[in-house]
A protein has these predicted regions:
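NAD(P)H-binding glycine-rich loop region in Rossmannoid oxidoreductase-like domains
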Residues: 44-45, 50-84, 113
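Conserved SAM-binding loop
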Residues: 93
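Catalytic helix-loop patch of NAD(P)-dependent Rossmann-fold dehydrogenases
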Residues: 83, 87-90, 98, 111-128
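A short helix->loop->beta-strand "cap" motif at the edges of active sites that frequently abuts
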Residues: 15, 98-101
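Alpha/beta-hydrolase active-site loop signature
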Residues: 25, 71-72, 88, 110
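Catalytic nucleophile-elbow at a beta strand-turn-alpha helix junction centered on a G-D-S/GDSL motif
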Residues: 1, 109-111
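N-terminal Rossmann/SDR dinucleotide-binding element
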Residues: 1-63
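SDR active-site strand-loop-helix element
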Residues: 21, 64-68, 103-109
Length: 128
């Protein structure tokens, strides 16, 4: 949902040469893409594999907005969180940095909660 909101905002600025990278899975997230304008879609794991094999063949990159971390505060699979949130982000950031691409990483509300206690950087779960 957050990623599609970003694409919508970019579309409203006349930007549509966007490669959407995601794991759509079996739910109905794909419906968020229907009204949007973008150049292509690629599975997240296939994209990361492509950066390792043919990183420069992916085309011209203006910026990477990485919003792919699992922000669920109820996720308990530590292996999944480390693979998805840490390793994937690290590998993507290293690839972007090696090519001098702008890399924007989105944090989440999981870091700060609902704000009722102000900002607290204390970690209550593996994601935060």
């Amino acid at each position: 949902m957050i990623g599609s909101a970003l694409v919508w905002a970019l579309n409203n600025r006349g930007i549509d040469n966007i490669l959407i990278v995601d794991r759509l899975g079996d739910d109905e997230k794909w419906k968020n893409l229907v009204p949007l304008q973008y150049a292509d879609y690629m599975d997240a794991d296939e994209f990361l594999d492509a950066t390792k094999v043919a990183g420069d063949a992916l085309g011209q990159v203006g910026a990477i907005f990485h919003m792919g971390a699992c922000s669920s505060t109820t996720e308990t699979d530590c292996n999944y969180l480390m693979r998805n949130n840490f390793a994937y982000t690290r590998d993507l950031a290293q690839w972007a940095s090696s090519r001098h691409y702008r890399f924007v990483y989105a944090s989440s509300a999981a870091t700060y909660g609902d704000g009722s206690d102000g900002m607290n950087d204390g970690s209550e779960n593996l994601y935060a």
